[in-house]
């Protein structure tokens, strides 16, 4: 099966389907991040964030003791920042890897709608 990156919007946008595969992004994240750095845009993995309560629940479910561990707050990013990265990567040879272009296209579709509505977002990973 494998991990998959997916976009979580700050709030729902009526009529927008936010579903995407995201597995290719997950499989190729290191090379995509390297390409983003060379292109002078923010790496995709830096848009990852998770609600601290969800993170704590996951960690406890994996047998880890969270205790007084202070987890970082959930971060939302502007759609415009995400679009800059997605568009730069779409034009790069790194997008030619298996399925990456389709995942980037889905990101661009979702983030374009988010930008029009002024909605923040972040990536989460489905394991």
Question: Where do the language-model regions lie?
Answer:
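Acidic (Asp/Glu-rich) sequence patches and key acidic residues
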Residues: 1-119, 125-127
